[in-house]
Amino acid sequence: VSLTSGYVSGEGDGKKMPVVMHSYNAANGSVAWAPKRMDLFTIPSAYDPEPLPWSTMLSVHESRHITQMQFGMTKAQKPFTWAFGQMWNILVSLVYPGISNMEGDAVITETAWTPSGRGRTADFLNYYWVAFDNGDFRSWDKWRFVSQVNNAPDYYSLGYLTMGGFRYLYDCPEFMSEGYHLAARRPYNLGAFYTTTRKLTGKKFNKAFMEVCDTMYTLWKADAEARKPYIPSEPVTSKSRFYTDYSNNLIAGNDIYSIKKGHSDAPILVRIDSAGKEHRVSRFAYDAGRLQREPESGRIYWSETSTDKRWNLQTKSRIRYIEKGSGRKHTVDNPQLLYNPSTCRSYIAAVRYEMGGKSYIDL
């Protein structure tokens, strides 16, 4: 996990690190106190699960972050920690490599060292594929700092495309190690990773990134050509002025129910009729599962995750539904963590997660 980062866990301060397991929260992980403690939130995602056990994915990904943060406690960077403490380490991690490159490097690690990893999922770089195919080639900064008009994937995807592309195209698996050691030796070089890019690729950072984009588009285009012919399609909704995303589509008779959201809009449930006219149904949760319609009653069910009002490290899941022709939401009360309901007449089947890691089907 640590080899190509140039550091190992504990190299900066020579101490062991506690790992705290949280089994009451949504899937996530963090390296706190920069880096003095690892927190693993072990309940796997019910809406975007990985084929590998979530605890394994977390262990590999967060362990890489531990090694990444060691450089701020070594060489010429170390004296600054005497004055600024742990704040300095997190600051230099954001200034020198940046959050995108750090997360992209960690995704490369989880992909390389496990049979799964986000780098192997089909939708992780899919937006770039579609964007390039429509002539949408942007500079790195425009992909990173999006606007209300132009969308972009999160910094995990951008970092993976960048770091993975450099490794693939220029054969430099030691890229992060070179950058970290340069930043540790010469704190005054705030562009240490730009310097490393020029050294290992012979090009400026943005030019090297654009070459990665061109190369990936060539590979993706060849793959797309081999998959022809495609099913023809046409737009159902009109083009919005600002970026808008329609997801979780559900066909109900002549209507389509969809979750609409964008950079300037919170998620809402909308109904699109056969004429393409959009009707607002209700506000919607940010973290929710797919829509499921019960044919006889016309009810639409889903599950959503919410944070406990008192304990913000504890999350709850509840099953909700709306009646046909209504926007009022109802809740199926249950103290368990229930996800992804499926309905048949008066019965509801749902997946139940246990704190210990087991899962069941509840009826």
Annotate each predicted stretch with a short phrase.
Residues 18-20, 174-179:
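Extended, well-ordered alpha-helical scaffold segments
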Residues 53-58, 72-164, 169, 177, ...:
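Acidic/His/Gly-enriched intrinsically disordered linker/tail segments
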Residues 118-123, 243-246, 260-269, 283-288, ...:
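A flexible loop/linker signature enriched in serine peptidases of the S9 family
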Residues 273-276, 323-327:
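Short loop/turn segments that connect beta-strands within beta-propeller blades
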Residues 295, 300, 343-345:
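Repeat-blade elements of multi-bladed beta-propeller folds
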